[in-house]
């Protein structure tokens, strides 16, 4: 069944139901630090009450309630031109389709695509550290335990020939996940240790597909910057500059993630990054030596940059 049928009471015929969640709130005035992180809280609340809503509907609701001027208020550009509500609606629609609806997959692509997982930095988890090796730490706290990269391939074998985590699922999902050729590619490296030259649905090798995914994530974030800059005439300057600044940090961090992961895993694949893709701009040695001096409860003003 689904979580939705539990929360609406239809699965177990309960007249009263509840749902709880965990999120990254802090002591900032807006709770979440990043203005757009509030959209996740809003989505959670809306789905708790009406699970049939689509992500597009929720995104549209949140954007209009967050950025539309108060009813009756006049919105002017710096040049004194009056902006019509239809103009703002069109820009919010673009923001919804090109940023809100794509933001999750963009982050997955430039951080941990194709089912990679737990390859972030020790402790605070900000930034990439697939090479992390802490003396005397539990193996399952360290990235190499999860990515299992070697000269043969990459990924954690949770199939019936490995830890058999796939056996926890009912048929036919069990069989689908257990087969490297039918396992959804966004989960592939979670369930399988896959050879670097394994052919993907795109026709590319696994190594090339990994490179394309990281590159796609970086370019998506750069597009977020372009879409957001279109919003300048339509919202207050304080929030515009705040989000613009945060997107600059995200764009730099995306390149940091891409370069760190591809250069590190390239040591095992021993293959070139496809020549049509953007070249790394950082040195692996520099990134491996870099340490962020932050706790688990704060975000840095910037990530790696050298």
Predicted regions and their residues:
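Catalytic domains of carbohydrate-active enzymes that cleave complex glycans
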Residues: 2-69, 84-305
């Amino acid at each position: 069944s689904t979580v939705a049928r539990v929360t609406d009471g239809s699965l177990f015929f309960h007249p009263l139901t509840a749902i709880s969640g965990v999120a990254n709130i802090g002591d900032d005035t807006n709770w979440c630090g990043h203005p757009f992180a509030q959209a996740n809280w809003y989505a959670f609340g809306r789905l708790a009450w009406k699970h049939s809503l689509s992500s597009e509907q929720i995104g549209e609701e949140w954007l209009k309630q967050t950025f539309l001027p108060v009813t009756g208020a006049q919105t002017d550009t710096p040049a004194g031109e009056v902006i019509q509500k239809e103009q703002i609606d069109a820009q919010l629609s673009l923001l919804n389709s090109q940023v809100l609806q794509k933001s999750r997959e963009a982050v997955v692509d430039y951080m941990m695509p194709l089912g990679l997982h737990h390859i972030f930095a020790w402790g605070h988890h900000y930034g990439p550290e697939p090479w992390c090796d802490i003396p005397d730490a539990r193996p399952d706290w360290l990235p190499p335990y999860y990515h299992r990269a070697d000269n043969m391939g990459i990924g954690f074998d949770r199939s019936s020939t490995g830890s058999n985590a796939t056996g926890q699922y009912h048929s036919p999902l069990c069989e689908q996940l257990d087969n490297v050729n039918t396992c959804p590619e966004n989960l592939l490296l979670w369930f399988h240790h896959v050879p670097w030259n394994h052919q993907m649905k795109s026709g590319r090798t696994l190594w090339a597909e990994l490179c394309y995914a990281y590159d796609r994530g970086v370019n998506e974030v750069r597009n977020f910057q372009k879409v957001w800059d279109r919003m300048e005439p339509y919202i207050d300057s304080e929030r515009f500059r705040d989000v613009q600044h945060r997107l600059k940090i995200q764009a730099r961090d995306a390149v940091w993630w891409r370069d760190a992961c591809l250069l590190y895993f390239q040591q095992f694949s021993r293959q070139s990054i496809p020549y049509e893709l953007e070249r790394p701009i950082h040195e692996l040695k520099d990134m491996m030596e870099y340490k962020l001096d932050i706790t688990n409860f704060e975000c840095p003003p910037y990530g790696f940059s050298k």
